[in-house]
Curated annotation (Swiss-Prot):
This is Leucine-rich repeat-containing protein 51. SUPFAM superfamilies: Outer arm dynein light chain 1. LRRC51 and TOMT were originally considered as alternative reading frames, LRTOMT1 and LRTOMT2 of the same LRTOMT gene in primates. Residues 137-175 form the LRRCT domain. It is found in: Cytoplasm. The lineage of its organism: Eukaryota, Metazoa, Chordata, Craniata, Vertebrata. It comes from Pan troglodytes (Chimpanzee).
């Protein structure tokens, strides 16, 4: 199967689903059997999954150490991951490893322990990210939570399972002008 055929078929493939497995560390995925759904997973000749979705929700992960290596062991084309579900784990930050998946369009991080709203800045490099969840994290309690995320990630069309409207965008822009100070340009003055 060539790469173009793979891209056309894997979008409809069921996810590689490791949800509700009490997984503590990413490396455990290699020895764990994924959950089975109504449709069987398609595999490559090498035995790797032909999907673009990886579900790790409802586990006890507190970091994503070795995520890239494990994804490469499980998926035929890990670089094509489009959907990662890490909801309901024990993550305290947004691991930069997630920013290496440039085809990521759906990222679920709700129900974790992410404290700092500034963690969202890391996701700004993902050009295809359209759907993001962060509710149920301590950061949700910060003033301007929704507006900050929408300002930082202007391509998002769905946030916390709600569509982003034009009014949301306008409110976020007004909030940004009122709350985020622009960086001042330093001008070196000539000394005579």
């Amino acid at each position: 199967m060539n790469k173009r055929d793979y891209m056309n078929t894997s979008v409809q493939e069921p996810p590689l689903d490791y949800s509700f497995r009490s997984i503590h560390v990413i490396q455990d995925l290699v020895n764990e059997e994924p959950r089975t759904g109504l449709r069987p997973l398609k595999r490559s000749k090498s035995g790797k999954s032909l999907t673009q979705s990886l579900w790790l929700n409802n586990n006890v992960l507190n970091d994503l150490r070795d995520f890239n290596q494990v994804a490469s062991q499980l998926l035929e084309h890990p670089e094509n991951l489009a959907w990662i579900d890490l909801s309901f784990n024990d993550l305290t930050s947004i691991d930069p490893v997630l920013t290496t998946f440039f085809n990521l369009s759906v990222l679920y991080l709700h129900g974790n322990s992410i404290q700092r709203l500034g963690e969202v800045n890391k996701l700004a490099v993902l050009p295809r990210l359209r759907s993001l969840t962060l509710h149920g994290n301590p950061m949700e309690e910060e003033k301007g939570y929704r507006q900050y995320v929408l300002c930082t990630l202007s391509r998002i069309t769905t946030f916390d399972f709600a569509g982003v409207t034009k009014a949301d965008r306008t409110t976020a822009e007004v909030w940004k002008r009122m709350n985020i100070k622009p960086k001042k340009a330093w001008i070196k003055r000539n000394t005579l």
